[in-house]
């Protein structure tokens, strides 16, 4: 079993290119369907963590939600270079509330 799991980031080109310097695999997308297919492909090829920019995620909610119910991959929403939509923050808050029974954030 591979000790090191792969990490990828999906989003618009300007937002994801900086992650390449950190050694993270980057997958620039333009169209919603391209984003769906990319996330599905990453999930099927052993990526443990997939970061998705909020601006991309807002248009592919059903794909994001499908992976929320699974242990791996962890799909984590991040702000794009255009700023945040607070979707990722809200998801974390919801998950914490679900886990502990009260919103502590």
Swiss-Prot record:
S-S bridge residues: none
Pfam families noted in UniProt: ATP-synt_F (PF01990)
Signal peptide region: none
Domain of life: Bacteria
Gene Ontology biological process terms in this record: proton motive force-driven plasma membrane ATP synthesis
Alphabetically ordered keywords of this record: ATP synthesis, Hydrogen ion transport, Ion transport, Transport
GO MF assignments: ATP binding; proton-transporting ATP synthase activity, rotational mechanism; proton-transporting ATPase activity, rotational mechanism
NCBIfam families given in the database record: PRK01395.1
Function: Produces ATP from ADP in the presence of a proton gradient across the membrane.
Family (UniProt): Belongs to the V-ATPase F subunit family.
Listed name of the protein: V-type ATP synthase subunit F
């Amino acid at each position: 079993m591979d000790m090191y799991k792969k990490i990828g980031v999906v989003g618009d080109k300007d937002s994801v290119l900086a992650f390449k310097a950190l050694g993270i695999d980057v997958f620039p997308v333009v169209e919603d369907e391209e984003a769906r297919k990319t996330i599905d492909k990453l999930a099927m090829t052993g990526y443990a963590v997939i970061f998705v920019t909020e601006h991309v995620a807002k248009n592919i909610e059903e794909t994001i939600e499908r992976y929320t119910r699974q242990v791996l991959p962890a799909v984590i929403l991040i702000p794009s270079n255009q700023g945040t939509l607070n979707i990722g923050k809200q998801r974390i808050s919801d998950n914490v509330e679900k886990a502990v029974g009260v919103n502590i954030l």
